[in-house]
């Protein structure tokens, strides 16, 4: 039986996760030119400045009408059996603090993603086919629209999945249901904590044994 994480454990998980994300970061706020993969999804007006806390939730449930980007039609729809394999990329600084397609605010440090057609917000399992790492991510934005990529993930997700440096990875994406409008991410955090690769990483954190 799976035992729910207590609030203190959730807080500790957040600290450990922050430490892991911080490891390997450059000293500059932005990555070196050319290092950050770009999405052709249009960016909205920035409403949260760099360094300021990004509120969770605040958006609405949205499926949307068919739309066209660069001559290609996309048809949003409920798709409970969605299970696709393809190339993932990530987006970060250029979109951080801006509104997503359903009215939330993109946080590059959150476990989130953008998808061309799945309902917003929804949950998906994303597995890196090269290293086997899997995350549960909140889909709250539209995109990507580059080279038939199947999903754009946040910078944090790309780092956890192990492809931040390279920029893209072959992944499997599976629909996991609707996400709460409140932005509650405890389900994603619990799934992360349950992964063996993540627990190994925690065991190597500088203060893991304290």
Spans of model-derived segments:
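Bacterial N-terminal signal peptides that target proteins for export
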Residues: 1-13
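Secreted/periplasmic proteins
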Residues: 2-4, 25-210
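Bacterial Sec-type N-terminal signal peptides, specifically the leucine/valine-rich hydrophobic h-region
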Residues: 21-22
């Amino acid at each position: 039986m799976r035992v729910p994480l207590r609030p203190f454990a959730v807080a500790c998980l957040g600290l450990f996760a922050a430490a892991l994300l911080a490891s390997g970061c450059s000293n500059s706020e932005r990555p070196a030119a050319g290092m950050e993969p770009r999405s052709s999804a249009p960016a909205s007006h920035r409403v949260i400045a760099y360094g300021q806390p990004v509120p969770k939730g605040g958006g609405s449930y949205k499926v949307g009408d068919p739309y066209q980007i660069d001559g290609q039609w996309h048809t949003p729809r409920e798709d409970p059996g969605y299970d696709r394999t393809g190339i993932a990329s990530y987006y970060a600084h250029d979109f951080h603090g801006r509104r997503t397609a359903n009215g939330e605010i993109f946080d590059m440090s959150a476990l989130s993603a953008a998808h061309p057609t799945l309902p917003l917000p929804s949950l998906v399992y994303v597995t890196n086919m090269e290293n086997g790492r899997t995350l549960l991510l909140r889909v709250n934005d539209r995109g990507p629209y580059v080279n038939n990529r199947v999903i754009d993930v946040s910078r944090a997700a790309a780092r956890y999945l192990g492809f931040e440096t390279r920029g893209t990875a072959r992944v499997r994406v599976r629909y996991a249901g609707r996400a709460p409008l409140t932005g509650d991410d405890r389900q994603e955090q619990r799934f992360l904590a349950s992964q063996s690769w993540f627990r190994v990483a925690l065991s190597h954190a500088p203060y893991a044994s304290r």
